Amino acid sequence: MEDVQNSPSQVPLAIDTVGVKSLHLPLIVSDRANGHQHTVAVVDIGVELPARFKGTHMSRFVEALAHWDEHLNYRTIKSLLEDVKTRLQARKAHVHFRFPYFIAKKAPATGSPGLVSYNCCLTGELADGRPAMMLDVEVPVMTVCPCSKAISDEGAHSQRALVRISLRMKEFCWLEEFIELAERSASSPVYTLLKREDEKFVTEDAFAHPTFVEDVVRAAAQQLEAHPSVSWFRVEVESIESIHNHSAFARIEKHK
C-alpha cells in the first residue's frame, strides 16, 4: 500500500510540531494524602517533522499512548517521549497533559468535607538526552481590596482570583506544595462546601488580610524563589474584579 506521508513535501519547510490534539486518556497522578488518584487528561502529543516529508503518521501517536503506563511521573513521560521519537523516527517529541486534580478540603469552622478541583498541566519535551518538563497549576483564591477597605465606612469589595504558576523543578514535588503556596499568598482560600459558620469565618478572615493583586503575586514569587526544588518559575495572578467590567493582573518570572 502506498505510503503518502513519506512522499516528498511540495513545500520544503520543517514543521516545529505536528501530531494529535485533545485526546482523552485515563491518568494516575501522585497524591500526597492518598498515594495516588485517578483522573482524566486531555493530551496533545506531537513531533518535529523534517522539511523533506509530506506528513507524519498520526496513528502512531495513538498507538504510543495506548501502550503507555497511565502513571504520570518523570520516568513514564521520558519513556513515552522516547517511544514516540522511535515510532515516528523524529528528532524531537512533545507531550502535553491537562487534567483536573482534586483535594479533599474541610471547611474552616465546621470541618464539613468537600472536594476542590485544580486545573493542572504537565508538559514534556525530548530532543537529545534528558527531557525538559514544565508544571502548570491554576489555583482559585479570594482577595479583598485594601484600598476599598481603607476608604469605605462599611465593607470592601472582594472577588475570586486565579493564581497561575508555571515552573521547572530539579526533583519531584507534590502538587499540593504549590497549591498551598498560592492559597497562603491571598486573602483566603476558596472552598466547595461552606455552612453559615464557615462563611462567617472566611469573610472575616479574608477582610482581616486584604491583598492587592500585586501583593499576591509578590508573596507567591517570594515563596517560589525560596523553594529549593524550583529552578525557574512564572507566576501570574488574575483578579476577576467584582466592581469592574475587567480583570486586574500581575506577573513575575524568574530563573534561579
Curated annotation (Swiss-Prot):
InterPro entries, sorted: GTP_cyclohydrolase_FolE2, GTP_cyclohydrolase_FolE2/MptA
Pfam families linked to this entry: GCHY-1
GO biological process, any: tetrahydrofolate biosynthetic process
Keyword Hydrolase: yes
Site positions for May be catalytically important: 145
Gene Ontology MF: a single term: GTP cyclohydrolase I activity
Enzyme class: hydrolase
Catalytic reaction(s) noted: GTP + H2O = 7,8-dihydroneopterin 3'-triphosphate + formate + H(+)
UniProt keywords, alphabetically: Hydrolase
Enzyme Commission number(s) of this protein: 3.5.4.16
Function of the molecule: Converts GTP to 7,8-dihydroneopterin triphosphate.
NCBIfam families: PRK13674.1-1
HAMAP family, alphabetized: GTP_cyclohydrol_B
Family: Belongs to the GTP cyclohydrolase IV family.
Name this polypeptide is given: GTP cyclohydrolase FolE2
Lineage per the UniProt record: Bacteria, Pseudomonadati, Thermodesulfobacteriota, Desulfovibrionia, Desulfovibrionales
Gene encoding the protein: folE2
